[in-house]
Amino acid sequence: MQQEIELLGDERFESQNRETASERPAHSQSDEDLLDGYSRTVITAAEKVSPSVVYIEVEQPIRSRRPDAARTPPERRGSGSGFIFTPDGFILTNSHVVHGARKIEVTLSDGHKCQTDLIGDDPDTDLAVIRINAPNLVPAQLGDAQRIRVGQLVIAIGNPYGFQYSVTAGVVSALGRSLRAQSGRLMDAVIQTDAALNPGNSGGPLVNSRGEVIGVNTAMILPAQGICFATSIDTAKFVASRLIRDGKVSRSYIGLAGQNVPLPRRIVRYYDLAVASGIFVVSFEANSPARKSGLREGDIIIGFDDHPTAGIDDLHKLLTEERIGRQSSLAVIRGTDKLTIDVTPEESENRDHK
């Protein structure tokens, strides 16, 4: 915004001094030309991806704890955005837009409405895939997250507050951010942007100047201005492939509840530990891998398969699909002793435990 103010100030100064075009260096562009070029870039990118953007309306049952509640629960309506990414009707959106929905309806850019099948959703990355059956669909072109640079132009397209196909522009403010998903897990490799997002933008595409999707718009920080986030398209590609193949994203779990705690300094020094904190084991899920391993309440986990774990988020990142059924080792502080305990992670079923 400061740069924009300075540009406007320069225009006024030049106008007051009545500088003519002939007095300018031949190789320089006027501010008007630069702004026209910026506008053309945004317009071209938006026009390229707009046919792929969809408006999503959902109906979700409202659960009531009252015993006298009606047998047919009342419904809550919500909306969001998404985008077609395959010619045969697969659509990416946010998990929080469609999770638990009884009915999902998609409106295409031409106004055509389609009933929708939920293929799968992954609350841990706030991503979901739905599918429609319609002819002549235009899939968005997916970009490469490895080519994103801080400061580059990005355009967000969505349906804020039900106003369909709204376009905002900004820049990539930062890369590699972490954001807490509604499931409690930490999402990594998140893109921060100042392109304005509002309720209803969720699930829409964040595109570069070539109209390639580089992120899935997911969240904004309120009441802050200009702090919005998008899930990296590389993460979205991986999650979408798993949802289409399996209807879910498999992760491993060991079945414990814990909290992050600092380690006594003398323990850190004595064992020359790579971390100064760990995971204090509070409880276990019944018959869980952690319970069967011999781990005890009060133990402090400081490592998993030779990877330091300074906290629960570190352990979450390591409990991947590849570790399901494979024996792993936990580095543990018990009292003043350092132990190694073998554990075999099992497949997670969206449990609250780790």
Indicate residue ranges for each PLM-predicted region:
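Conserved PDZ fold ligand-binding element
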Residues: 91-92, 290-312
